[in-house]
């Protein structure tokens, strides 16, 4: 589907904002935003007990329906007796230096904050085409069929701006 066909799904107010958002998307694709400081998550696997409180806190904070999970705790097991292994992997958006999802968005809804490097989605510009979901190697953008939008971790940006920790971190 071409960008023009995709953009037809937006309302008039959102359509008016698309050219500027696309211009920003194109500029940051070829000249990535270098934030003043880059926020990210560091997960200490030794401290994690696999309780998934971080997942629940994230779903509560973001009002997510069953299905999408911005924070995911997965278990990796393998080997054969007596040489077995098991560990937990805690995944969310990596807020990449050069996010693959950003140039994939036809409306420019995905953007990277200059002050802290958090990659975010403007839900008023998202049309739910799922291109970002297909390009992210980490599975961060996730489609929410209840809104027909793609959503992802934004590090609880409202909490960070208020001087607090993201919900997943506080719940751990």
Locations of regions flagged by a protein language model:
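Non-ligating segments of multi-cofactor redox enzymes
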Residues: 1-171
């Amino acid at each position: 589907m071409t960008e023009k066909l995709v953009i037809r799904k937006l309302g008039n107010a959102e359509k008016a904002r698309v050219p500027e958002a696309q211009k920003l998307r194109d500029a940051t694709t070829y000249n990535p935003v270098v934030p003043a400081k880059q926020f990210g998550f560091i997960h200490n696997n030794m401290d994690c007990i696999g309780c998934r409180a971080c997942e629940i806190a994230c779903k509560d904070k973001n009002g997510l329906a069953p299905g999408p999970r911005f924070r995911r705790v997965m278990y990796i097991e393998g080997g054969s007796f007596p040489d077995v292994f098991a560990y937990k992997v805690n995944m969310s958006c990596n807020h990449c230096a050069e996010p693959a999802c950003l140039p994939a968005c036809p409306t420019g809804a995905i953007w990277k904050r200059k002050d802290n490097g958090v990659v975010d989605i403007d839900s008023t510009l998202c049309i739910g085409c799922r291109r970002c979901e297909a390009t992210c190697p980490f599975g961060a953008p996730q489609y929410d069929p209840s809104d027909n939008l793609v959503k992802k971790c934004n590090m609880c940006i409202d909490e960070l701006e208020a001087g607090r920790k993201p919900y997943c971190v506080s719940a751990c």
